[in-house]
Amino acid sequence: MGKGTPSMGKHGRSKTHIVCRRCGRRSYNVAKGYCAACGFGRSRRMRRYSWQNKKWNRVRVV
């Protein structure tokens, strides 16, 4: 099969994100190699901003 419209339906088969081994959330992008939630794989420091309200290791950090 080529690269047209029929092949676009095959994109949803594989998982884009898997469980991150640092934060435990299903946010680790396999193709890009980093976690969208904590920044693992891109930075040694935890991805954190003042405007967000997230959980680290399933514990709420404000």
From Swiss-Prot:
Binds to the 23S rRNA. Coiled coil: none annotated. This is Large ribosomal subunit protein eL37. The keyword DNA damage does not apply. Belongs to the eukaryotic ribosomal protein eL37 family. A zinc finger (C4-type) spans 20-38. Binds 1 zinc ion per subunit. PROSITE patterns: RIBOSOMAL_L37E (PS01077). It comes from Aeropyrum pernix (strain ATCC 700893 / DSM 11879 / JCM 9820 / NBRC 100138 / K1). One of its GO terms (molecular function) is zinc ion binding.
